[in-house]
Each structure stands twice: as structure tokens, then as C-alpha cells.
Amino acid sequence: MYLSEINTYPIKSTHPISIKAGYLFPTGIGFDRNWMVIDANNAMMTSRKYPKLLHVFSCIEGSNLRVILPQQDFLIPLVPLPNTPVLVKHWGEELMPAWPQNPALDAALSDYLGLPCRLVYSASLQASEVIQTASFADAQPLLLTTTASLAALNGRLNEAIGMDRFRANLVVSNLIADIEDDWKRIRIGACELEVTYPCERCVLTTINPVSLTKHEHQEPLRTLATYRRLEEGGVGFGLNLIVVRAGPIAIGDTVEVLP
């Protein structure tokens, strides 16, 4: 088995950046979900409800993040200067401090999404640790999927889907479907990762990231429910992980299952 994809999502719930190599810090991949879009009530906006976020692109250029909208793009610093923080709602009533970014970008985002919104950066990040924290992650720092499990799912679907439906940070190429259910700990290159729990999948998997349309029969969730039910309810695909031993990773690295 080997690592075949590495993805980071600088702006939560938007298009990923695929990289050939990176560094796994104790809190995940560099620059992963350091930014988030919020609405007029300072609440998190995600592509579950606002699929057009999936067509917001970004790329790292030197010391800046370029945010690319369909009609224009903006440069914002990777290490923003501190300003007056706002309290934003992440999950439920959980409040987190965040820094507003660029009024012109906010206006363009609002126009694109059709409602008032802002891009914010996690104020909990210090400049020295900016690349180390997935501050707006849903659950654990890392999400891993495997190619064999996707192939098995596609074998059950009338229409095949891509791995991008599952928004993984790490994709492992392997031959046996769902074998990752038994993993407790793995090594990728010099890094060691610990499995915390399976990833429960949500309605976002039913949205085509290219056309932004939702599947009329709720696929792949409906098919996953026939054979990937979790004990706690819901359906699972992929694993949530934490970093036990930090270090560099690269596409092609061997993936080893540890006791």
C-alpha cells in the first residue's frame, strides 16, 4: 500500500489544494482549514448548505493565500496581522475567536454566494504555529480513505463517483476493500498515525463537486447504508486519525499497518 493523494483545505468547505509532499504536525497538515466563511450571524457556512463554496479555489503563493472566485481573485497573507476578533459559531453553539480578513474579498464572496458573508481566520493561531493547526476542522485533524473501498462502493452504484466526494486529506492506494476497518495505527513514511474512529458521512457526499447538483436518490449515502452502517447510527466511509509521530510525507510513501 502507498500514499497516492495529499489534500489540504485552507478555507473550510471549499475546493482542496492537492500537494505532492507536506508535513504532518501533531495537529494535521499545514494550512488545513485555518480560514472559514461565516454568515451575517457569525455562524459557520459549509458546502452542505451552500454548494457554491465548492467552486471557491485557493492556492499558496509565497507568503500569501490566493483566493480564487469565478470572476476575480484576491491575495491575503498566510499570517494575518492581528485585528479586532469576532466570536464565530463553529459547531452548534461552540464559539471561537476569529479575525476578519479583507472587506473587498468579503463583498465579492457575498455577491457570489448571494448573501452577506465574511472570510475569517482563526484567532487562536499564533504566527509561530500558523501552519500547524487545523483550527476549523469538523472532528479530528486528518481524514483518510482508500482506493479499494471506493472501487467497492462504485461497484454497487449505478454511476461511479470520484474520491473528491469524500474530501480526504490522505488517500491510500490498496487492493482490499474496507480493510481499514481493522486498522488501529499506521505508519506513513516516518510518521505514525492513530485511528480514532470511523468517519460518519453526511449529505455533502451526495453533491457533485463539479455540477453542484445533489443526487436525486441520495447516493452514495443510500448505497453505503446497505453495507457500511455504524454502530452509533449513520454510515461510514474512511477514518479519522490523529498524528502520533510528526514528520514529512510524500506521495508514493509506503503505508504500513502497525499492531
For every predicted segment, state its role.
Residues 1-259:
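Metal-cofactor-dependent catalytic cores
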